[in-house]
Amino acid sequence: MTYAHYYEKNNVNPSHILYQVTDGKSMTDSPYAIFLYLTRHKAYQHLHHTWVVDSESTDQHYRNQFQHLSHVSFVIKESKSYLKALTTCKYLINNATFPAYFTKKENQVYINTWHGTPLKHMGLDIPHSLIKTQNTMRNFLISDYIISPNKHTTTILDHAFKLSPIYQGNFLEIGYPRLDLTINSTEADIRKVLS
């Protein structure tokens, strides 16, 4: 099956969320902070969470870690399950980019949390970078929301990826969820992670 087949065939499930972090290498960063918030609050227990992982070993590791949560599943990047999830999840949360073939459906909500504060040249601010930059530009342009920690990041992303005036979504200068997770962690939370 191809992505185009799944795109045409599958309906969007309003209670499903897909999370992707750096091509599925880990469960970290702002998508993970959002996931933890949603799984810990009763109001969101109806949601099903699907995480993208990069390999069978990563898949098995996280399945074991989250086996107590029946509403959490994992898909290996570029698998049929991944293609299906890309076309059926209502909410898509990514800290980088989805593949170049990805096309957001009209009734999907794409939240890009990006993964840092730009203190270097990026995007089209780097000479001769159009080919390397085009998928990132496209991902930003199709996102509904870009989460930004501050005005500096908003300005740099907007300029480096030439988003204005064509970007139809919204920059949310609300800080990165990952920082809330860090600041609000208790000593017990930290000890559990480190053990």
Which residue ranges define each predicted feature?
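Extended catalytic core of nucleotide-activated donor transferases of GT-like folds
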Residues: Y32-L36, H41, Q67-N135
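Tryptophan-centric aromatic hotspots in well-structured domains and transmembrane helices
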Residues: W51-D54, Y110-W114, F161, P165
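Hydrophobic/aromatic residues located in beta-strands of well-ordered beta-sheets
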Residues: H49-W51, Y110, I146, F171
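A nucleotide-sugar donor-handling region in carbohydrate enzymes
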Residues: G123, N135-S195
